[in-house]
From Swiss-Prot:
Keyword Lipid metabolism: no
Species name: Saccharomyces cerevisiae (strain ATCC 204508 / S288c) (Baker's yeast)
Reported function: Involved in spore wall maturation. Catalyzes a two step reaction that leads to the LL-dityrosine containing precursor of the spore wall.
Gene Ontology MF terms: catalytic activity
GO biological process: ascospore wall assembly
Protein name: Spore wall maturation protein DIT1
InterPro entries (alphabetical): Isocyanide_synthase_DIT1
Stretches the record annotates as Disordered: 1-23
C-alpha cells in the first residue's frame, strides 16, 4: 500500500489525512505471505515500510507499506510510540538511528505479525526530510544493517519532500490515457480496464500531485543474445536505436499534455543474468557503454529523457558502499552453468542481490511441482526459451541432450529466483516510480507492458516470405532488439523489419534477396542493420 501525504501535525485535531491528500493501492501484494518463523530471511523479506517524514513535525511525506501492515492508518500513533523509545546508532553508520519496538506494541501496526520491529532513520546531506524504514527483528546481522543503510541512502525518495500542488486538471488521468494510447502493450485478458488503470493512476499521483516530472523504470537492454541465429554481433544496433528514439519521443509527446514531462530509467539486468545466458560479464559492460554512446547521439540536446543504471551501479554507489565488507556475503554461492568469463565485481553484486532480496525460501521448488501452477508455466517458459537461446553455445556442444536439458532446467530455475530478487531490489530503490516492462503483462499492476519498438517504426516478422506480423501471447517472447536484428527491405516502401538474423541469412543464401549488413555508426547514432533487395 502506498500513501503520499502531508498529514496535519500532532498539534492539530485531525489524526488522519483527508481522502484527497493520499493515494493507496488495494492490490494483493506478493510479499504478504513471507514466513516469519525464525528462518534466515533476506533483508528484503524483513522490510515492512519505507517512508519519508518532516524534520520539523510529525507529517509524513510518503509511505510505502509491505506485508499488509497498517502504519499509514495509525501514523500519529506510530510516531508518538517511537518518540518514546530510546535510540541507538547503527553498527555500520552513526548517521542511522535505530529504535526497537517489542512485538506486543508492534502488532497493531504489523497486522499481528508477532515479531518485534526496528525503526531505522537517516537524513541525507542534500535533504531536510527524514528517511525511515521499518524492518522485523529476526536473525540480525551486519549485512542486514548495511543493507538497510544502503536502501535508506540510495532509495529514490528525494521528491517526497516536495509539497502537494493543487491543480484543476486531472493530470494523472491524462497520463493514464496517454500511456494506454502511446505505449501500452495489450494482450488477451488484459486487465487495464478492470483495476489496472486505477492502480496506474494512483502510482502516477506521487508525481502529478506534486506537479513534477513523472519517472518510470524499465528493466531492459541487458546485452545481445549469445545466439548468432537471433542477432548479428554483440553491440547495440538499429533495434536499440529505434527503441531509444521511441522512448525519447514518448517523453516529449507527454509534455504537450503534462508540461513537467516524463523520464524513463533503463535499469539494465545484464549483469543479473549474464552468466545464465552465456554472455561474458565484460561483454555486458561493453554493450552498456556502447548503448550510452548511442543514446548520446540520438538524444535531443538539453532534454533529459532517459537515465541508465545497472546492478553494479545499484550496489556500488552512495555512502553505504564505502563501508561494505565482502565477507558478509561469503556464504552466498552463485551457480554458473554456461562457462562464461566472470567479473569479480559483478559476481559480488549477484551475491549481494541474492542475500539481500531473494524471497524464495524453498517455495519455487514446491510451486513448480504443482501441475497448473502459474510458476510452473513460467518455469517451463523460461526452460523453452533458454533451450533455444543456448542451443549453439560452444560450452554445451559436447553435452548429451539429456544433460543439456538438465542444465537448462537448473538455469531456468535460477533465472526465476534472480528475476524475483532483482524485482524486489528495484522495488526498494525505486519505490514510487511507474514500473514498465518489455514483457507482456495483464496490466493489472504493479508492472505494465510496453512495446519498445512500435509498429510504425518497424514491423515484426518471422519470415521474409510472409511479412505479416505474428501474434505473441507468451509472456517471455515479446520481440526485443537484443534477441533479434533489423532488416531494411529496399523497395517502394523502404520499410524496416525486426526478425531473427537466421531468417535474413537464409534468404540471402537461397538467392531470394541480395544485400549486406551495415555496421553501427556510433559517431552519428545510426544502428547497424541488414539492407537487402528482393531478386526478381
Amino acid at each position: 500500500m502506498t500513501f503520499t501525504s502531508n498529514l496535519p501535525s500532532s498539534s492539530e485535531q485531525s489524526i488522519s489525512p483527508p481522502a484527497s491528500s493520499f493515494s493507496s493501492s488495494t492490490d494483493t501484494l506478493k510479499d504478504i505471505d513471507i514466513p516469519h518463523n525464525g528462518a534466515d530471511l533476506s533483508t528484503y523479506s524483513k522490510f515492512l515500510a519505507l517512508y519519508c517524514r518532516s524534520d520539523k513535525c510529525d507529517d509524513f511525506y510518503s509511505l510505502e507499506e509491505k506485508q499488509n501492515c497498517k502504519f499509514g492508518d495509525q501514523w500519529l500513533d506510530f510516531i508518538n510510540t517511537i518518540h518514546n523509545l530510546d535510540f541507538s546508532e547503527s553498527e555500520v553508520s552513526g548517521r542511522v538511528s535505530e529504535r526497537i519496538l517489542p512485538a506486543s506494541l508492534a502488532n497493531k501496526f504489523t497486522n499481528n505479525l508477532g515479531v518485534a520491529i526496528k525503526i531505522s532513520e537517516y537524513t541525507r546531506d542534500d535533504e531536510r526530510q527524514i528517511r525511515g524504514c521499518v524492518t522485523t527483528v529476526e536473525n540480525e546481522n551486519s549485512f542486514n544493517n548495511w543493507f538497510v543503510y544502503h536502501i535508506l541512502d540510495q532509495s529514490q525518495l528525494s521528491l517526497s519532500e516536495h509539497p502537494i500542488v493543487t491543480k484543476e486538471v486531472k493530470y494523472h488521468e491524462l497520463f493514464a490515457d496517454f500511456f494506454e494510447k502511446n505505449l501500452k502493450n495489450t494482450i488477451v485478458n488484459d486487465q487495464w480496464n478492470f483495476g489496472g488503470r486505477d492502480y496506474f493512476i494512483e502510482r502516477s499521483r506521487y508525481f502529478t500531485d506534486r506537479y513534477l516530472r513523472i519517472e518510470c523504470i524499465l528493466p531492459a537492454f541487458p546485452c545481445k543474445s549469445s545466439n548468432e541465429q537471433k542477432v548479428y554481433g554483440s553491440v547495440p544496433d538499429k533495434g536499440e536505436e529505434l527503441a531509444l528514439k521511441r522512448l525519447i519521443k514518448a517523453t516529449q509527446d507527454l509534455v504537450k499534455i503534462y508540461p513537467p514531462g516524463m523520464k524513463i530509467w533503463i535499469v539494465s539486468d545484464g549483469h543479473v543474468f549474464s552468466d545464465c545466458i552465456g554472455v561474458d560479464d565484460d561483454v555486458v559492460s561493453t554493450y552498456t557503454t556502447k548503448l550510452h554512446e548511442l543514446y548520446k547521439r540520438v538524444a535531443i540536446p538539453g532534454v533529459d529523457a532517459i537515465g541508465f543504471c545497472g546492478l553494479n551501479d545499484l550496489f556500488f554507489s552512495g555512502a553505504a558502499s564505502k563501508v561494505f565488507d565482502p565477507k558478509w556475503v561469503s556464504d552466498v554461492e552463485v551457480a554458473h552453468y554456461t562457462g562464461t568469463q566472470i567479473c569479480p565485481k559483478s559476481d559480488l553484486s549477484r551475491q549481494i542481490l541474492m542475500k539481500g532480496c531473494d524471497t524464495d525460501a524453498g517455495r519455487l521448488r514446491k510451486q513448480i511441482a504443482i501441475e497448473g501452477h502459474p510458476r510452473l508455466h513460467l518455469y517451463r517458459g523460461f526452460s523453452r526459451f533458454m533451450m533455444e537461446d543456448l542451443s549453439l553455445l560452444e560450452h554445451f556442444q559436447s553435452y548429451s541432450r539429456k544433460k543439456f536439458k538438465k542444465i537448462i532446467s537448473m538455469i531456468a530455475f535460477n533465472m526465476i529466483k534472480r528475476n524475483d530478487a532483482y524485482s524486489n531490489l528495484v522495488e526498494l530503490i525505486f519505490p514510487h516510480h511507474l514500473r514498465i516492462s518489455i514483457h507482456a503483462h495483464t496490466n493489472s499492476g504493479p508492472k505494465f507492458g510496453i512495446k519498445v519498438i512500435s509498429n510504425e517504426q518497424c514491423s515484426i516478422v518471422s519470415s521474409l516470405e510472409d511479412l505479416d506480423e505474428p501474434k505473441f501471447e507468451d509472456f517471455l517472447h515479446i520481440p526485443t532488439p537484443w534477441h533479434n536484428c533489423v532488416v531494411k527491405v529496399e523497395d517502394e516502401k523502404e520499410k524496416y523489419f525486426l526478425t531473427k538474423s537466421k531468417v535474413v541469412k537464409e534468404a540471402l543464401e537461397k538467392g531470394m534477396y541480395d544485400g549486406v549488413w551495415k555496421d553501427t555508426r556510433f559517431d552519428i547514432g545510426e544502428g547497424g542493420h541488414f539492407v537487402i533487395k528482393k531478386i526478381s
